[in-house]
From Swiss-Prot:
Species, as recorded: Psychromonas ingrahamii (strain DSM 17664 / CCUG 51855 / 37)
Reactions catalysed: a 2'-deoxyribonucleoside 5'-diphosphate + ATP = a 2'-deoxyribonucleoside 5'-triphosphate + ADP; a ribonucleoside 5'-diphosphate + ATP = a ribonucleoside 5'-triphosphate + ADP
EC number: 2.7.4.6
Recorded family membership: Belongs to the NDK family.
Protein name: Nucleoside diphosphate kinase
Amino acid sequence: MPLERTLSIIKPDAVGKHLTGRILARFERAGLQPVAIKMVRLTSEQAEAFYAEHKGREFYQPLIDFMTSGPMVVQVLQAENAINLYREMIGKTDPTQAAAGTIRADFAESTRCNAVHGSDSPASAAKEIAFFFSDDEICPPAAD
């Protein structure tokens, strides 16, 4: 199976609770290798552009407010079947419905403050990765 990339965001709630290292370690233990990583704080304009597909929905403005409330860690993770592996690890959006042992079950507070974001398809991964990273910011994976 070919290598695949996904975008991972450790959201402001998890960064603010000093969970970044614990979450990153889980990804690495699962074989999701970081090939790009940085800490950012989105402006309202950036958050609106990233979440443009949700504009007009009732949760849109609270989502923008939350995603601009503090720093977050964005990264590109690479592995075979990276998107599905990542999504299995993070669990359902609603932490009360997330399986035990998933990141959201362990660290999330609510559907909005749910610790992490992950791409849901190869098309969204490509779009989301390009939003945060230029091609020259993405490194080849480290040798095993």
